[in-house]
């Protein structure tokens, strides 16, 4: 904070509030937040959050909120300044004992402090009896859980994040005692890294296709492939999406047929979302929006309905 070099989002993930680990979780958060507040005179980094793993019942969230209130009272932190994210890692976090969605009650228990919900691929698949060989971000069980999160938390302002790829792009062979690797070892390292990169690229692309624009990375070498997947996702469709949106807007949002694709008013927001997400991540430049026939001010309304109303007034 002193050197103004922090990332735009930052936080701490504590241990889960299980019987075995709750005391450690509370102690860790107390020490961390108290020390941070003391060093910064009660100022938190921008977008600071506490991530709560393995949340299964609203009482877990309520307990954290109560702890937040105690910490804010005993330090110089402003009231309600501590925010949290939920990790959705078990079937109990998706559906409660009555078969209802558990997610709204978990968020409600946060008393307005919940900013995000993160899907935990490997704990969730293990909880649904998927064997280790078939645990993956693209497993149908994971798609179901992520879709439930979207349906339950859509429109609430809670950001959704996908899980991680657990295959590391790290070769199995390393030089020892000054001996260089053989050609076959170098080739095997290359193959392992490229396979891991390919898997990570495909996983990120899968998340994007399902409407998840944020995800976890476990290794620095995952980052280049996330950038590649995100930029590829948006740039490959930029030309066609621009034509569709421009044609649609040019006909005052009447239904249009571009090639073999039929667009009506229901498509408008989806097309707008494409540009909003692309601009947000940096893949699409604001000047690219001009090709759609929309102005930047119209794009910034984030609402296709408002754009239409503005043009009709």
Role assignments for model-derived ranges:
Residues 1-313:
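Expand to "…catalyze enediolate/carbanion chemistry for C-C bond making/breaking, isomerization
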């Amino acid at each position: 904070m002193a050197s103004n070099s922090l990332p735009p989002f930052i936080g701490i993930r504590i241990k889960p509030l299980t019987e075995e680990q709750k005391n450690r979780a509370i102690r860790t958060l107390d020490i961390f937040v108290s020390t941070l507040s003391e060093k910064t005179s009660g100022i938190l980094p921008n977008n600071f959050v506490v991530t709560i793993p393995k949340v299964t019942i609203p009482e877990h969230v309520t307990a954290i909120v109560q702890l937040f209130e105690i910490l804010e009272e005993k330090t110089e932190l402003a009231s309600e300044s501590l925010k949290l994210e939920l990790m959705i890692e078990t079937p109990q976090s998706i559906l409660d004992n009555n078969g209802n969605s558990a997610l709204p009650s978990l968020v409600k228990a946060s008393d307005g402090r919940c900013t995000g919900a993160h899907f935990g691929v490997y704990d969730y698949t293990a909880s649904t009896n998927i064997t280790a060989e078939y645990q993956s971000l693209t497993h149908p069980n994971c798609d179901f859980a992520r879709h439930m999160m979207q349906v339950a938390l859509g429109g609430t302002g809670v950001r959704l994040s996908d899980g991680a790829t657990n295959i590391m792009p790290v070769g199995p062979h390393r030089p020892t005692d000054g001996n260089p690797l053989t050609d076959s070892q170098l080739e095997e390292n290359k193959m392992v890294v490229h396979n891991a990169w390919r898997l990570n690229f495909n996983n990120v692309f899968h998340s994007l296709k399902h409407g998840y624009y944020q995800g976890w990375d476990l290794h620095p070498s995952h980052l280049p492939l996330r950038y590649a997947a995100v930029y590829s996702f948006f740039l490959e469709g930029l030309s066609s999406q621009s034509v569709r949106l421009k044609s649609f807007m040019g006909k005052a949002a009447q239904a249009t047929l571009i090639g073999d694709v039929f667009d009506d008013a229901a498509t408008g927001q989806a097309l707008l979302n494409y540009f909003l997400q692309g601009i947000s991540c940096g893949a699409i430049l604001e000047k690219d929006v001009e090709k759609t026939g929309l102005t930047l001010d119209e794009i910034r309304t984030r609402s296709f309905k408002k754009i239409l109303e503005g043009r009709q007034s």
